[in-house]
Amino acid sequence: MTSDDKPATHLFDQKRATYYEDRIRQVVPGYDALHDLSLLMFNREIGNAGHFLIAGCGSGSELSSLSRQSPDRTFNAFDPSSDMIDMARARVETENISNSIVFSTGTIDNILSNQKFDAATLMLVLHFIVDDESTKGKTHLLRGISDRLKPGAPLIFAEALADRATPHFDSDMNLWRQHLLLKGMNPTDEAKGFKKIVSQMALINEDRLNELLKQSGFTPAQNFYRAHMIHGWITRKV
């Protein structure tokens, strides 16, 4: 059940949800494989139970995947976008997910710091967070997640990694653009949207990623997935 007894189906726009699900698969190579492997990693790490923190829950893909095999898993899911929370709630209802789920519209600061979770996810979020020490920065988010995990608890996250200073950055970006078109994105949408998306991404390299994890109380990241620039990682609370 969700934290809101009010039915979410009236909020569920099937066309909008389908558009989002199609678009994310165009943008992220191997999107479904990423979630399948994340599920298997969690099964290996903590078994079929546990209390999960879903940071930046989006349309609810992680909730759908992680609840699939076990009704004993419970979740706290947050996202700063109320539209995404609405979509996630609707997905939970339409898929008849019976796990206990608490939704929050907001940031990591809306999750009580005295809660201690068995595991967390941060999927395709970090590359949109600025790399600074502000409350809107990567470090603040990672520290906030770390503070709410039990010692040794795993965090599985995925993000685009790249170094804008490398000579092959532009060719990597072009390959990504070609993938969007190959997967059926309208050329007009691609031309208008791609440059905007890339300009909004606070891309970092792997060295900087591990530096941020260390500062935030995590172990060095172990890579378990890669499709072009999209990487899947597991790290653990120290």
Give, region by region, the residue ranges found by the protein language model.
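N-terminal, positively charged/glycine-rich alpha-helical extensions of SAM-dependent methyltransferases
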Residues: 1-19, 176
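Conserved alpha-helix/loop element of class I SAM-dependent methyltransferases that forms part
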Residues: 30-49
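Class I SAM-dependent methyltransferase SAM/SAH-binding core
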Residues: 51-55, 59-110
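A conserved beta-strand element that flanks and buttresses the S-adenosyl-L-methionine
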Residues: 121
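A short, conserved alpha-helix within the catalytic core of class I
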Residues: 129-144
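Short glycine-dipeptide loop
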Residues: 149-155
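Core SAM-dependent methyltransferase catalytic element
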Residues: 216-238
